Amino acid sequence: MFVSIPNIRKAVVSLSVVPLLAACAFAPGMRFDPQRPLDPADNASVPKITPITPDLVRAGQTQAQVQASHENADVGPLLAKATPYRIGTGDILSIVVWDHPELVFPTQTYSIGSTYDLASFGGAPSVSGYVVSTGGDIQFPYAGVIKVAGKTQNEVRDEISRGIARVVKDPQVTVRVLAYRSQRVYVDGEVKTPGQQSIDDVPMTLVEALNRAGGINTTTGDNSRIRLTRGGKQWTLSMPALMQQGIDPANILLRGGDIVRVEQREDSKVFVTGEVVRPSTVLPRNGRLTLSEALGEAGGVSPVSSDPRNVYVIRRAAEGEPQVYHLDAKSPVALALAEGFELKPKDVVYVDAGSLVRWSRVINLLVPTATPLIGAAAVAK
């Protein structure tokens, strides 16, 4: 039986009608369907979609300001004025009584007592001097056992002067800490030189500790998420937010045993996918990232394949179900809303494809299938 090529073409077209009518459903690639239930067993579990409107943006900005104020209010216990260093257990002292070399520690000289390089001996156990005992005291000739823990260098100097006054007329005493070993803080995470740091006569503020650690790694460190742990309590500090609220991070005074950790920027990344020029992950700057900035980092919505009316932000809520926000970005004015909409860590920004693009993708799938049929008919003829 002879079948003409026109008839075969008609048959191919007829067979193609059914899938083409459902092109959107069969189109390859990802697609956001607001009616698709999250749980296949529960048809009512469709995601709730919240339009991104000026009111929503204003409410989000107000909430962010209130949250920042509460977080900054919590740093009150960390703010303190610097005070003179107080000697502690394990510190090594240099004590010199001028013009009385017999009272100088056997391995020390007058020059050690006056011009010793403290920085090069920061806690080294080989430094010779008077080691503060676990009981917080030292023993000095003619003065006997002296309680020095918790006192400043000047207070210890005055006490030694009074103790030796009966054998030394008008004593001139110099007391200095040679090695600071009683109090340490620990700096970890995304800094250049993590490790422990001894608290010395330079006030150990948060800024000082970070500077001694070489500063925050500008590539991987997140200066908006610095965790400070003290006595079982933890604070999350944001340098930009503190300064914006008028709080100087240099006024945050650390104590012995404090742990400072700079978190990774990578932990706060946002995913941009769908019909954008460069699907990618985007990292925040100074703890902030807006929808407009995220789209800009991804090259913007694709002018060829995207449907700007369907820009979505998918966010995981505390209860586990996703929150979905929708922006109609067809008009450039909508970019002002996108600039005011703050993203959160691990948000997913998705730009849907246009219906014509999905149709085209189905056609591209069907054409390779239909071509062999037409070719076979031509051979049969």
Swiss-Prot record:
Its main location: membrane. A lipid is attached at C24 (S-diacylglycerol cysteine). GO terms for biological process: monoatomic ion transport. A lipid is attached at C24 (N-palmitoyl cysteine). Keywords: Cell outer membrane, Ion transport, Lipoprotein, Membrane, Palmitate, Plasmid, Polysaccharide transport, Porin, Signal, Sugar transport, Transmembrane, Transmembrane beta strand, Transport, Virulence. Probably involved in polymerization and/or export of exopolysaccharide EPS I which functions as a virulence factor. This is EPS I polysaccharide export outer membrane protein EpsA. The lineage of its organism: Bacteria, Pseudomonadati, Pseudomonadota, Betaproteobacteria, Burkholderiales.
